[in-house]
Curated annotation (Swiss-Prot):
Keyword Electron transport annotated: no
Recorded GO MF terms: arginine binding; DNA binding; DNA-binding transcription factor activity
Organism lineage: Bacteria, Pseudomonadati, Chlorobiota, Chlorobiia, Chlorobiales
Species name: Chlorobium chlorochromatii (strain CaD3)
Any one Gene Ontology BP term: L-arginine biosynthetic process
Cross-referenced PANTHER family: ARGININE REPRESSOR
Listed Gene3D superfamilies: 3.30.1360.40, Winged helix-like DNA-binding domain superfamily/Winged helix DNA-binding domain
Compartment annotation: Cytoplasm
Protein name (record): Arginine repressor
């Protein structure tokens, strides 16, 4: 089964069932005759932007609505303390323990300006695709990490 069909089936299952985690989702997929590896399901969940939300005291996996991107952008923006750069790299300082989330968010945006990110505890190193586009990269980061 191709990725598009899996994504459709995952969305369908999450709309019809209360699913707490990937293991439960994997079981439901298998019950419906789909053979999916855990690693593949994990990638699918990341690509779909699935979130775990608390509902009536327990967690449930959900597909984010169209408003979720704006909300996530605002939440990630709150975690950023500063953005600085030199001629070759950009450094983002975050609240303690939040660098991984900020770096992961930037990676998921898949900008052609970003070659990659490396995150520590409170610092994200953003490696530009070209050192000639540092100012464009900084503007891009600011626009995608706004608090509003």
């Amino acid at each position: 089964m191709n990725k598009q069909a899996r994504h459709f089936k995952i969305r369908e299952i999450l709309q019809r069932h209360s699913v707490e985690n990937q293991h439960d989702l994997l079981q439901l997929l298998r019950e419906q005759g789909m053979s999916v590896a855990q690693a593949t399901l994990s990638r699918d969940c990341a690509e779909l932007g699935l979130m775990r939300v608390r509902v009536n005291g327990s967690y449930r996996m959900v597909v984010p609505d169209d408003n979720a991107g704006r909300i996530i952008k605002g939440l990630v923006g709150i975690e950023v303390l500063s953005i600085n750069a030199n001629e070759t790299t950009v450094i983002i300082r975050t609240l303690p323990g939040r660098a991984h989330g900020v770096g992961s968010y930037l990676d998921q945006l898949k900008s052609p300006l970003v070659l990659g990110t490396i995150a520590g505890d409170d610092t994200v190193l953003v490696i530009p695709a070209s050192v000639h586009n540092i100012s464009s990269l900084i503007a891009y980061i600011h626009s995608n990490l706004s608090k509003t």
